[in-house]
Amino acid sequence: MEKFTIYKGTSVPVMNDNIDTDQIIPKQFLKAIDKKGFGKNLFYEWRYLKDYDENPDFILNAPKYKKASLLISGDNFGSGSSREHAAWALSDYGFRAIIAGSYSDIFYNNALKNGLLPIKQPREVLNQLTKLSSQEEITIDLPHQLIITSLGDFHFEIDPIWKDKLINGLDDIGITLQYEEAISAYEQKNQ
């Protein structure tokens, strides 16, 4: 998993509440088990008209938001089914963090497990962030738990264990590999 310490990127506001995992990545695209390739179908029903013709009315298709890597959204983001593919699609598209009012618990944990930082903020802060220029870089300072913008700095909470995992780029396998020597010694001893 890629380390997440201090990240700078532009943002795109998709301010709907209750964006569910089927809207994030529809079920017809869930056949693969490799984490790559899902970004093309992120928000498929909203991004495309038919045959992958871009919907000019969907914000991600606006040229000024094409390189955005921070998603700002409303409450209850990632609700619905427990598909981990939703986090894969957001990451594969290029998002490194999501700033929303709240998340479904399963999506929140899936995002963290895949190196995608879900940040919770109150509606007042979300409304301020949507007023930023599409060209303004927002800084996410994970060690200090800050969102840094021209409008001010906004603190966010994160479980210290997840914070450490993200800063060190450690997923569950990476953590297990830290104990590889001890595991091997145990296996040798107990054969």
Curated annotation (Swiss-Prot):
UniProt record, GO biological process: L-leucine biosynthetic process
NCBIfam families: leuD, PRK01641.1
Annotated GO CC locations: 3-isopropylmalate dehydratase complex
Domain of life: Bacteria
GO MF annotations, alphabetized: 3-isopropylmalate dehydratase activity
Protein name: 3-isopropylmalate dehydratase small subunit
Record family assignment: Belongs to the LeuD family. LeuD type 1 subfamily.
Pathway connected to this protein: Amino-acid biosynthesis; L-leucine biosynthesis; L-leucine from 3-methyl-2-oxobutanoate: step 2/4
InterPro entries: 3-IsopropMal_deHydase_ssu (IPR004431), Aconitase/3IPM_dehydase_swvl (IPR015928), AconitaseA/IPMdHydase_ssu_swvl (IPR000573), IPMI_Swivel (IPR033940), LeuD (IPR050075)
UniProt-listed Enzyme Commission number(s): 4.2.1.33
Pfam families: Aconitase_C (PF00694)
